[in-house]
Amino acid sequence: METESGNQEKVMEEESTEKKKEVEKKKRSRVKQVLADIAKQVDFWFGDANLHKDRFLREQIEKSRDGYVDISLLVSFNKMKKLTTDGKLIARALRSSAVVELDLEGTRIRRKKPLGERPKDEDERTVYVELLPKNVNHSWIERVFGKCGNVVYISIPHYKSTGDPKGFAFVEFETKEQAAKAIEFLNNPPEEAPRKPGIFPKTVKNKPIPALRVVEEKKKKKKKKGRMKKEDNIQAKEENMDTSNTSISKMKRSRPTSEGSDIESTEPQKQCSKKKKKRDRVEASSLPEVRTGKRKRSSSEDAESLAPRSKVKKIIQKDIIKEASEASKENRDIEISTEEEKDTGDLKDSSLLKTKRKHKKKHKERHKMGEEVIPLRVLSKSEWMDLKKEYLALQKASMASLKKTISQIKSESEMETDSGVPQNTGMKNEKTANREECRTQEKVNATGPQFVSGVIVKIISTEPLPGRKQVRDTLAAISEVLYVDLLEGDTECHARFKTPEDAQAVINAYTEINKKHCWKLEILSGDHEQRYWQKILVDRQAKLNQPREKKRGTEKLITKAEKIRLAKTQQASKHIRFSEYD
């Protein structure tokens, strides 16, 4: 009994050790690639090319006395978040870095060498690329341009509103020679591309950019249509194949199966069966899907049988003959090659060699497809800068002409208002009086509404009041309303009228209003009225003090031009009504 219990304990111990080993194996994590990616990313951030352009990181280094930056700052970057959020793992990855070094605690890093001055030949080493794919990223550009040399920095501008790439990028190389090589080898713009290079998109702030996804969706729809058509063609071919197979199977079934029937059959019956077989062969060869290249007679028989038929069938027959001739040529070549190989060695060895050759050819074709020419336009940055200057000069000229046209339109409109039918002195005096009244009204508006007692009516409802427009319309049917102070969902509101008489008229018409709406109406007076007038002034001041977007330069001109264009279109679209007497 003791021996049995001892054996059981040993078995249990062995099982537990095995389980521990399995757990240890599972715990082991492979982080070589992650460590390499972390080291590469941090080396780029602290490299000369990036630090000369990255103001934020440069300021963080300059703030510290020793030039150290906390690893927690790197963890806050989005690209590092994708790799890891563990500071210890980052420290482990940077131990053998050639660009940065760790402090004694392993929580901070700094550059090994101090940052020098910005190189003067930066623009000469940089190339401008356009006609990029819509979903372009840094890794794609690095893979394409890495063939020409060591890529130091990549800049892909994006739209702020949508986040889509603008369709161009800047690639900085290590040397001028590498940049020149990239311009020489990768500058292959397609025929459809515009003649002049350079994309200078100018969009108004907060204005939606024409979505690129719409174009992509259209392309996807086209692809789907193409696939559907292909599938339909394949189905049609399969149906044709099925019909041909069924016809062949029918002919096979018609043949005699028993041996007794074969002996009893006469010679004329054999001749008929031979003719039927020939017809079957002709039918099989007439189908474009089933190619029988070895049987040359079938194609000639097809030509003889299909000659008296219609023109459409003749065209089909020509295509079939072409296919048959191509297949026969291929077979001839194979026959010649097999005859030569018979002299040299066995047929099996030759077939193996042929298959190998075919595989090699396929692989070569695939490699060629992989090394296809990418349709890009590549220029030097200095050339792009010249194009940018040209574009800005054109923009300046166009804006100047737009400014002139706007001023001309304004002057013409003023002339039209002033000129017209010759006016009397009395009419002129009336005009001047009206102008003075307008000026006084403008002054009043500038100071705000003046205090008038008995003008404000308070409206109370058991349910939430309808919209401001509906309240205004119901009150305006009785007397003129200047303003309705109402927030959405409120049960109380205030209406301001022009004169106390107008407010009193609304109170008098309470019975009419109460039929449609269950409202309580009262004119404010005393302290309540004074408090409300103070509220009006405070609200007005708050509204005036709100920050406004200042439109300047090209934006201001474009908005003015748009307003003029809209006014002209509205005038043009007006319906001209003729009276009965015209």
Swiss-Prot record:
Q: Which residues cross the membrane?
A: none
Q: Where is the xRRM domain?
A: 450-563
Q: Which UniProt keyword terms apply here?
A: Acetylation, Differentiation, Disease variant, Dwarfism, Intellectual disability, Isopeptide bond, mRNA processing, mRNA splicing, Nucleus, Phosphoprotein, RNA-binding, Spermatogenesis, Transcription, Transcription regulation, Ubl conjugation
Q: Which GO terms describe its cellular component?
A: 7SK snRNP; cytosol; nucleoplasm; nucleus; ribonucleoprotein complex
Q: What Gene3D superfamilies does the record point to?
A: 3.30.70.330, Winged helix-like DNA-binding domain superfamily/Winged helix DNA-binding domain
Q: Where is this region: Disordered?
A: 1-27, 188-368, 410-442
- Where does the RRM domain start and stop, copy by copy? 125-203
Taking the record's annotation, the residue ranges forming a coiled coil are none
Basic residues: bias regions: 219-228, 354-367
Source domain of life: Eukaryota
A GO molecular-function descriptor: RNA binding
Quote the InterPro entries the UniProt record gives: La_dom_prot, La_HTH, La_xRRM, LARP7_La, LARP7_RRM1, LARP7_RRM2, Lupus_La, Nucleotide-bd_a/b_plait_sf
Q: Name one Pfam family in it.
A: RRM_3
Q: What is the effect of changing residue 483 to A?
A: Reduced binding to the 7SK RNA. Does not affect binding to U6 snRNA
Q: Which CDD domains match?
A: LARP_7 (cd08032), RRM1_LARP7 (cd12290), RRM2_LARP7 (cd12542)
Involvement in disease: Alazami syndrome: A syndromic form of primordial dwarfism, a condition characterized by severe growth restriction that has its onset in utero, and results in short stature and undersize. ALAZS patients manifest severe intellectual disability and distinct facial features including malar hypoplasia, deep-set eyes, broad nose, short philtrum, and macrostomia. Some patients have non-specific and inconsistent skeletal findings, for example, scoliosis and mild epiphyseal changes in the proximal phalanges, but no frank dysplasia.
What does this gene product do? RNA-binding protein that specifically binds distinct small nuclear RNA (snRNAs) and regulates their processing and function. Specifically binds the 7SK snRNA (7SK RNA) and acts as a core component of the 7SK ribonucleoprotein (RNP) complex, thereby acting as a negative regulator of transcription elongation by RNA polymerase II. The 7SK RNP complex sequesters the positive transcription elongation factor b (P-TEFb) in a large inactive 7SK RNP complex preventing RNA polymerase II phosphorylation and subsequent transcriptional elongation.
| Domain text | The xRRM domain binds the 3' end of 7SK snRNA (7SK RNA) at the top of stem-loop 4.
Name by which UniProt lists this protein: La-related protein 7
Per the UniProt entry, what species is this protein from, by scientific name?
A: Homo sapiens
